[in-house]
Amino acid sequence: MANPTIIRLQDGNVMPQLGLGVWKASNEEVIAAIHKALEVGYRSIDTATAYQNEEGVGKALKAASVAREELFITTKLWNDDQKRPREALQESLKKLQLDYLDLYLMHWPVPAIDHYVDAWKGMIALQKEGLVKSIGVCNFQIHHLQRLIDETGVPPVINQIELHPLMQQRQLHAWNATHKIQTESWSPLAQGGEGVFDQKVIRELADKYGKTPAQIVIRWHLDCGLVVIPKSVTPSRIAENFAVWDFRLDKDELGEIAKLDQGKRLGPDPDQSGG
């Protein structure tokens, strides 16, 4: 079996291409989920202030036998904290029981309140101080990203966006790539695979490779060069989602999955919502 792949970010730091998402997991659930994930081989954990489970993540990491330098921990600056990124980060670090973050992401641009450029400047300062190794954003459209770059000269290393076979965001993914911004997929299985796992091409590929539909979709993300963070608290599914290193999809198969794109957004529109 091939080793899990690592992505090099434009700031020179590296991160695992596949991680564990913990959205909607309780503090108790997340402890067991991370224990299982680390046992299986995950080294990247993606949480957020808004998930209200940073304390559980911190307890799980404290109890882990994996060295801190082997882990890649991400959390996110919530909308209400865009004018106080330093305080918000310090609160997150305390809950996570960490001295630094590997990746700090701004959760939404929230253009209606228009604080995201100032928040980004604050995050740049936190990176310079060494409190965070890398900084990025979530749910930013091209015009939001361009404004960050124009006004600060510092591009995000990551843009984490809703991305799955029904919502492939090819234009944004390509723009990110042109600007050396790594695209990361949230809701990569389209919220449990509804409308995806029953697609003929997904079922046929699952049969061909002896894999589950979820594994086919995760492999599609990986083979498209995306960082992917499927969420689960179910031990068997956590293991299943990581067992994707012994096969690859070919160009034609990727092309067939590309045809599933409907522009079907399951989450909020970044221009209309604050999450």
Swiss-Prot record:
Which key words are in the record? Answer: Cytoplasm, NADP, Oxidoreductase
Against PROSITE patterns, the record matches this protein to: ALDOKETO_REDUCTASE_1, ALDOKETO_REDUCTASE_2, ALDOKETO_REDUCTASE_3
Residues binding substrate are: 107
> GO CC annotations?
cytoplasm
Which catalytic residues are annotated? 51 (proton donor)
Q: Which NCBIfam families match?
A: PRK11565.1 (NF008598)
Full protein name: Putative methylglyoxal reductase DkgA
UniProt organism field: Salmonella typhi
